[in-house]
Amino acid sequence: MRLNVNEISDIIRNRIKQLDIGCETRNEGTITSVADGVIYIHGLSNVMQGEMIALPYNKFAIALNLESSATGAIVMGSYENISEGMVVKCTGDILRVPVGPELLGRVVNALGVPIDNKGLINCSNYYPIESDAPGVIDRQSINEPIQTGYKSIDSMVPIGRGQRELIIGDRQTGKSALAIDTIINQSCSGVKCIYVAIGQKATTVVNVVKKLEEYHALDNTIVILASASESAILQYLAPYSGCAMGEYFRNNGQDALIVYDDLSKQAVAYRQLSLLLRRPPGREAYPGDIFYLHSRLLERSAKVRSEYIERCTQGKITGKTGSLTALPIIETQAGDVSAFIPTNVISITDGQIFLESQLFNAGVRPAINPGISVSRVGGSAQTKIMKVLSGGIRTALAQYRELAAFSQFSSELDNVTRKQLQHGQKVTELLKQKQYSCMSVACQAIILFAVSYGYLEDIELSKIGDFEAKLISYLTYHELELVKHINIYGSYDSNIENKLKNILEMFKLNKFS
């Protein structure tokens, strides 16, 4: 069969018409250098700060340095197979992590990938790790408490839902223990908890998970681990991932609590990344934007109005407020709260709980220094009964510390001074509390009532602990209805005052005489 020229040209035209050549625009670049997990890329245009960059071998990097001639990015995970000359491309999206109730009870890494050998997590929602904090109009004043279960904190340094309360102190002073007990105390309160472990040993976090499971708090908690053995980029990202998970609950009209343990290690990880990216170092070799690192994270914790919730859920949830409470932890060196990172975070947060190593070593647990520990929300975050009964505690302790220091230089003391010293010693003894022994509002209230109304005056200092234990046992078994009422409503009136007086008088007469 022979074809003429016209037939050949017709066949070619038909083939050309049938061709479907797709047109695809890609934002690609070439790796020019690889060192210590940092890659520099030439040719990327319109790349965003924090954007995910797709690498060969199904790996990703995050763009952190946007320079005129190149883009500096940090590889997430191993960079062994990444080499110069490889082609990379922008994804057009920043890092997102899975969020939702499916994560409760699980241990995940900084990217939301499960690491507890309990199978995959099927989440239908993903949030970006970086998001804008709620504006001033969207926020609501804080008027509900987060009960820590510690007498000293709930009475002197109350924490409200939506507050940012810093826990600061030297190493081994009980900072993590305080935060873990607060999480355990939320197991029946409906507050969802997120515990972010940054730069800690994996074995330490395993013990924390076991304790949460033992006290039935794990099912209400998400644990995020970026251990000391993991890369600096994951330790830097972990708090933002945890915050995104907490924001999901807040934006759906629920209350959430997040613990950052601790932000000192995140600052160190960010310093490593910044120095690798050749950013100019400042004070203590930290980069110039180290304040912004923590401020943009902690400002996302807030109590928001019902209109904000309605807007976030597109009208699905109405008439509900939500909150995200943050407990950042900062480690100090030799009690120096005036160092760079501590002063930064103190200025961002709504108060601080300062734990002192001298008090800790003296057996005062929790080792709270009431002089410089403060809550800027104050009594508005307390129930009425706690607000009324806790008023004289801080004053009594302040007077006791002043007199105790003065009495060291005086050989003879008058009766009034001696009584004040004895009262201060008893209050200090009464505020001591062991780990994993959280107290309900009712139990705290009757103890504070006993202090305020002088029921401890005739009790020896050595018997204060025994008095407290027996009083709580008596109250729980004989006045269950009153306990339930105080725990639910937190109200205080002359009727409750008379009931508490009768309980204490009967207890001292029959059970502790």
Swiss-Prot record:
Highest taxon of source: Bacteria
Matching SUPFAM superfamilies: C-terminal domain of alpha and beta subunits of F1 ATP synthase, N-terminal domain of alpha and beta subunits of F1 ATP synthase, P-loop containing nucleoside triphosphate hydrolases
Topology with respect to the bilayer: Peripheral membrane protein
Record site feature (Required for activity), residues: S373
Reactions performed catalytically: ATP + H2O + 4 H(+)(in) = ADP + phosphate + 5 H(+)(out)
Subcellular location: Cell inner membrane
Pfam families: ATP-synt_ab, ATP-synt_ab_C, ATP-synt_ab_N
Cited InterPro entries: ATP_synth_asu-like_sf (IPR023366), ATP_synth_asu_C (IPR000793), ATP_synth_asu_C_sf (IPR038376), ATP_synth_F1_a_nt-bd_dom (IPR033732), ATP_synth_F1_asu (IPR005294), ATPase_a/bsu_AS (IPR020003), ATPase_F1/V1/A1_a/bsu_N (IPR004100), ATPase_F1/V1/A1_a/bsu_N_sf (IPR036121)
EC number: 7.1.2.2
First-listed, main subcellular location of the protein, grouped into a coarse class: membrane
Molecular-function GO terms, alphabetical: ADP binding; ATP binding; proton-transporting ATP synthase activity, rotational mechanism
Assigned keywords, A-Z: ATP synthesis, ATP-binding, Cell inner membrane, Cell membrane, CF(1), Hydrogen ion transport, Ion transport, Membrane, Nucleotide-binding, Translocase, Transport
Binding site for ATP: G169, D170, R171, Q172, T173, G174, K175, S176
Transport in keyword set: yes
GO cellular component: plasma membrane; proton-transporting ATP synthase complex
EC category name: translocase
Free-text function comment from the UniProt entry: Produces ATP from ADP in the presence of a proton gradient across the membrane. The alpha chain is a regulatory subunit.
Family designation: Belongs to the ATPase alpha/beta chains family.
Full protein name: ATP synthase subunit alpha
Organism listed in the record: Blochmanniella floridana
